[in-house]
Amino acid sequence: MDVRQKTSLPWGHQIARGNMFQAHVHHQFGRNVACPTTYVPVSDNGLYRTPQAGAATALRIKAGGNAADTANGAGARSVRLWGINASGDEIVEDIATNGALASSVTTNQFIRLYMAEVLTSGTYGTQSAGSHVATITIENAAGTQDWAQIQLNGFPSGTTGIGSITVPRNHVGLLSSIQINVDQTKTTDLIILKREGILQTSAPYSPIVKMQEFIGVARPISIRFDVPIKFPALTDLGVLAKVSNGTGAVSVDLEVLMLEAET
């Protein structure tokens, strides 16, 4: 394409191409195949860890994986983590896999982890060969808390599914759309929550507040907000879901535009 054609592309295309100064988009996808009848996060393992700044922790890959998911193996060789540190800044760190053993711990200390994905693999991925062999679990350095999972899901997914995200320091998050998919054999209730002031260390704390609620969802729905919902810096944005009976599968896709140097 020539320059004139490129510059005439719509706003969203320019964002996706990285052409908008101090702006980027997160398509934050989450799934939970076993939502119960009480509210839980829409994430692979039903968790989104939110410790206070004083409890920041290094992370690692949990022991118990597959021997092929190792630094020189046929499976996942390294994993990249995205999250927030105790200063409220976004951090990204790569860690080498270590087969069935626990990996080395990260250099960074995390208070949020909103995405992990396979970075390098020993296998050229195809429709019949994925990029990791087993579920990869991310845990705290002490080995006492699971934080996230890169699951198989019938086929190696290569990434986490976490329907929550946190707005870094010196940014504003604009939620412009949400796609919801549910188990159509039952009804599902979902709520979008926000909690500002994630670095607060003593009361009074900012409350956790319901921003949107969807009751009795029985089919996929897609909602675009003509005026996006604003989430200020240092704010958690999360989706919880519950089903009417038993357990059920739920997935969400959040389109969040992050604007830097905004208040």
What are the residue ranges of the model-derived segments?
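Beta-strand-centric surfaces of beta-sandwich/beta-rich domains
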Residues: 1-112, 119-263
